[in-house]
Amino acid sequence: MELKLLQDNGTLGAGVQASPEVFEREYNEALVHQVVVAYQANARSGNRAQKDREQVKHTTKKPWRQKGTGRARAGMSSSPLWRGGGRIFPNSPEENFSQKVNKKMYRAGMRSILSQLAREGRLNVVDQFSLDAPKTKVLADKVKAMGLDSVLIIVDQVSENLYLASRNLHKVAVCEPQHADPLALVQYKKVLVSKAAIAKIEELLK
């Protein structure tokens, strides 16, 4: 599989050979969907909470007597039927949203995503990607000069300059091969991978 080399001025240069085992797989939409949804579900922190009738602060006094008023019987104002009462099935911070995806399936999903990105021309290779100073403007100008808008940059090792410069650009993300995730790969319009990172990705996903 040949991946196009992207120059600093935005032109495409000679191709770079990549493993067909990783970058030339058939696209499996169902598997990719499962892997992305599982990744998002596992990232949920469970930070929502509601109160049931036991936790709501209300008096336990019976609102009115059981019989003789003509009104429907009522036990206490914390009933879920009442305004301001507890929830019948409240959400809890202890809820478990995690979904299990086997390592084999996860790797297959990642290979499928990378292969589809390569087919669509959204995956390009660079010799290396580095900055001389930790300046956001320097990175923004470099990305713009390459004709990129929304981009995920995968490098062998993220330097401090690159990390600091990318923090304030919401359409630019930087990571190392072992930290690349399926959501980021499908979320950004373009993916830039350094030559050294290509070798690492192939090693991780074979």
UniProtKB/Swiss-Prot annotation:
- Where is this chain compositionally biased, Basic residues type? 58-70
Which InterPro entries does this entry report, sorted A to Z?
Answer: Ribosomal_uL4 (IPR002136), Ribosomal_uL4-like (IPR013005), Ribosomal_uL4_dom_sf (IPR023574)
Entry GO terms, CC: ribonucleoprotein complex; ribosome
Q: Which domain of life is it from?
A: Bacteria
> Does the entry feature the keyword RNA-binding, yes or no?
yes
Q: Which UniProt keywords apply?
A: Ribonucleoprotein, Ribosomal protein, RNA-binding, rRNA-binding
Q: How does it assemble?
A: Part of the 50S ribosomal subunit.
Q: What is this protein called?
A: Large ribosomal subunit protein uL4
